[in-house]
Structure formats: structure tokens, C-alpha cells
């Protein structure tokens, strides 16, 4: 058997990025083993054919049942609780990277690699995720929940490249058709509107939730909506209500099946509470003078400060304008391009009292 330190398991989707990952690592002298996780939809024929062309071992892991029972179920449950989930953030630690580690151990691979546009950096004994060089493709936001034990076995070959450079590389290597392929920006298990997906997976949802009321911030009923799971904080389009001025979703109350509407100014926040955090070094995070947080994928980093509350939650104070704080989304903390950690945005109910209790925090 070859030296395992040069044997790497690559998560192969059959797409542009995983194909380039395999080729780049081959050029660097690694022995490549490919595994394709079938989690939804058709057989991964592209990945099989690419592996055969590259002359690498290839396996298919049929994970449709556990994927549906964990990631898809969580996605549905979050909307049923009035939250806005990001399934990639859940999938990476609970499913994708966990499965890659298990397969790597089974196949004698010390390393795992994926086509994520991110980098890794070791500093002070810790491994940090660093934003990829292509700002349009950077995926560091989705990786904050990965633990140190996983990161120490990861290789992200595409972190220093732009998407166009990767396409050019594949073209040069003779993979012209692959280099010209398009790519989907959708959630991998949803084609189209997530609301249709919820109805398809939960035929009882409409009857269970039923229509509810749009209300103003004063509690005045403004009109009926189709059910709280079909809305998200900050939403303006698709509300199907005419108020004579732009209206945005401010709050969602699952218990009362109400959706509060208001103007853009009412979406602004000075603080937020976050939970279930994963921080690389807490002392560094809390003392960081240049800390910034992203509260949505592709959103601009917002300068902030963070402190730990007595109940274990994080209190985040924004130092610049922040808007549309959506429970269920991720708050990812950066110093420059380096990820210091992240957390899930919690329910903001009762935040006024939390702010009052921490009014002396500077």
C-alpha cells in the first residue's frame, strides 16, 4: 500500500470544482480516491465517468435516507418554527464532512479534500478558515461549524483561485466541455421555490398552519397571509398585500401565526443575540479590535463587538448599520479574511431586557 500521507479522499460531485480539485492534487503527487455522496436525485454518472478518465478509485455512497432524515428534516423543521435555515451550514459538519472523514478512515486516507473556495491557515496552534481569493465564490461563511479535528485533515485546493481561473485550468487540461458547464446556485435538494418544496414534503402543512394575519408593529391586522412558514425576515417581494408603500417582514410569530410588516427603517438593529456558537479562540474573538460579522451569505461584513452572556448566548453589538436579523441564519465573525468563529442567530424576543442588563458594556 502506498504511503497514506499522500492518499487523499476527494468529495466528487462530478462538477467543475471537484474535477479541478482531483486534477490539481494529482499534479501535486497525491494518490486520489473519489467518493460521491448520492443524497438526492439521479445516479452520479458524471462523477463515475470523470473518475474513470482520471484513472482514480471511485465509490458511491448512497446516503439519501440519512440525508433526508437529518438535513432535509432540519430544513423543514426550521421553517415550521418561523426561522430561516441555511442547509449548507448544517450539512457540512453533520453530514458532508463527517461522512468524508468516515470514508477516509475506511479507505486509508489521511486527508480529505473538497472544491470549496476557501483556504486554511495555522496560527497559534489553531487552524483557521480563511476566505477564498474569489470574493464572488468564497464559501468560508458555510464552514464555520467545522471542528479543529476535521480542519486538520482538510485540503481546499481552490482557495487561491477564481472561478474563471479554474475553468481555464480545466480547458487547458483537456476538459473543455466540463470547463463550460453552468452551475446551480440553489440548495442542492430544491429546484425552484422552497415554499413548493415545503408543501411537497409536508402535504399537511397548509391545513396544520392555516392562513394567518399580517399585522403592523402596533398589532393592527393588515390582511391575511398564507401561513408563517412561507415568509422570512426582511422579505419584501411575494407578500401579496397592497399597503400603498413598500412593506417588509419584521417579525414572525409561529405561536400566533402572525407576520409583522413595517418599513425598511424598522428592520435596523443595533444588537443581536446568537447561540450554538463555534469559536476558535474566545479570548481572541472578544478582544479583536477589527472584528466584523456577516449575517447572511454575500452580505457585507459589519464591524461589531461580541460578549458572552450568563446564559451562554452571545450578544453582538453592531458598530455600523445592520438590518434584517433573521433567526436561523448564521452570524460568522471575521478578522479581515480570517474566520474567528460563528453562531446561529437566535430569537430576538426579549432582547430589550438583555440590552438593558448590559447597558454598561462599552
Curated annotation (Swiss-Prot):
Protein residues bound to ATP: 11-18, 37, 115
User: Could you tell me which SUPFAM superfamilies the record lists for this protein?
Assistant: Adenine nucleotide alpha hydrolases-like
Q: Name one GO biological process term.
A: tRNA wobble position uridine thiolation
Q: Catalyses which reaction?
A: S-sulfanyl-L-cysteinyl-[protein] + uridine(34) in tRNA + AH2 + ATP = 2-thiouridine(34) in tRNA + L-cysteinyl-[protein] + A + AMP + diphosphate + H(+)
Where, per UniProt, does this protein localize?
A: Cytoplasm
* Alphabetized GO MF terms: ATP binding; tRNA binding; tRNA-uridine 2-sulfurtransferase activity
Q: Which InterPro entries match?
A: MnmA-like, MnmA-like_C, MnmA-like_central, MnmA-like_central_sf, Rossmann-like_a/b/a_fold
Q: Which CDD domains match?
A: MnmA_TRMU-like (cd01998)
Q: Which keywords fit this entry according to its UniProt record?
A: ATP-binding, Cytoplasm, Disulfide bond, Nucleotide-binding, RNA-binding, Transferase, tRNA processing, tRNA-binding
The intrachain disulfides are 91-188
Q: Please name the top-level EC class of this enzyme.
A: transferase
Instruction: Please indicate which residues carry the site annotation Interaction with tRNA.
Output: 116, 329
The keyword Nucleotide-binding is annotated on this UniProt entry = yes
EC numbers for this chain:
2.8.1.13
A Pfam family of the record is tRNA_Me_trans_M
**Primary subcellular site in the record, as a coarse category:** cytoplasm
Which residues are named in the active-site annotation?
Answer: 91 (nucleophile), 188 (cysteine persulfide intermediate)
Q: Which family does it belong to?
A: Belongs to the MnmA/TRMU family.
- Stated role: Catalyzes the 2-thiolation of uridine at the wobble position (U34) of tRNA, leading to the formation of s(2)U34.
Query: Record's HAMAP family?
Result: tRNA_thiouridyl_MnmA (MF_00144)
Protein name, as recorded:
tRNA-specific 2-thiouridylase MnmA 3
Species of origin: Bacteroides fragilis (strain YCH46)
Q: Which gene encodes it?
A: mnmA3
